Amino acid sequence: DIIGTIPSMYAGALSFLERNLKHVQNGQNFNTQGELEVSKIALEEIVQNSLTHRDYTKNAPIRLLIFDDRIEIISPGVLPNSLTIEGIKMGNAVVRNNLISSFSTKILNYRGLGSGIIRAIRNQPNLELYNDKVGEQFIVKIPRM
């Protein structure tokens, strides 16, 4: 379990993902550490979004799951109001947690409302977004190499 303040949970989540994902050479020298098998920028944006925009009225944790073929980041709660997957891909946003969103600009690598999903997709074009209304959760799936 990753618990604590939002900045410590953010750092803990990224640390967990980086420790448990492969690093690949991608043409680098033999002795280099290599690059993460998926976009680190996309992971940062998705983890940040999951902490900032999750539904805190749901008594459920954010889940970070690593499978052989994919990574899943699951946030409690569906997209708020009339927000859709297509809309967030275009930068549309609805603030669910006003106080957390306002502090995110100061405590995280927050780049502005509505820009995170666009940036994640630009850096990891094959990621998939699911607004699971039955399970009341938002799921991001990132295929692995």
State each model region's role.
Residues 1-11, 38-145:
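Conserved beta-strand-loop-beta-strand hairpin that lines the nucleotide-binding pocket
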Residues 1-36:
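Helix-loop-beta hinge of the Bergerat
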